[in-house]
Amino acid sequence: MKKIGKRIRNQALKRIYEIPFLQKHADIAYRSAVHNHAINLPSLSATDLTLVETVKQEGVAIASLEALGIPSALKMFDIAKLLMPEIPGIVSGDKNEYVVHATPGQMVENPEIFLWGLEKRILNIAEHYFGLPVAYQGAFYRRDIANMVEHKSRLWHIDTEDRQVFKVIIYLTDVSEDGGPFQYIPRPITEQVVRKLKYKCGYIQDKNMLEALSPSNYRSCRGVSGTVVFAATGSIFHRGKKPVTSDRFAVFFDYTSRLPKYPFFSQYSLPYANLLSFSEQLDRYQLQSLLWQEYVIE
């Protein structure tokens, strides 16, 4: 009952925030914050600047852990691979089940995975994408089951929980076209489809998407184990294509800015006490991204 009450309250607040006058005022404040923060953006290498520009224009950029060369990546990746046998294939028996996540306990027991999302280089890339300080929304370790279910994140959608959403996806297994690749529609084409379908939010069946554009516009992010996908999921239609040959294992690292569009939806991905235990290993910049609710931009 408590969860239902909170959901009803949040939906009511969302409708208030979307009153045109209030929304316009919030949008002006947001643009002003981006403008004012421009001089405070961290420096990036030419390679990372190109990556950010690719994400802004296309919606996605693809790299690899090896090419990124972040020192902690090897240990994180090895630990993530070792966790794979601990993630069950089926847990509920629900015929619509298509994904199993690592439990909060498993994430706490393997902190290297969660903490990798707070690597300064990754935070700096995300900050340049947003133009604002970063809120780290957490790491989500998932096993996508090889079956024919097309539900929720396997349907076309745009992440609308904030103005912009940024994700870093690491494949733990080789992902072929039949292995459940992350799929997207390039940003310029997404914008056309949004207008054509009058899209606001929610999920779109593939048969309905095919009425709006040719499947030749679909892009599949195939890659070997260790492939890294940077995605602006708040600006592009995307989905996880259903895997049919084998289960897909991947870790998703999620980010928004510290100026949320709907602050009442905000919640940490792990218990606060666990986040505090992680904080001992972080500098101030990383800590502010981790405990971002305490450092929201006013």
Name each model feature, range by range:
Residues 2, 22, 191-298:
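Conserved double-stranded beta-helix
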Residues 10-154:
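Non-heme Fe(II)-dependent double-stranded beta-helix
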Residues 154-160, 236, 240:
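Histidine-centered catalytic micro-motifs
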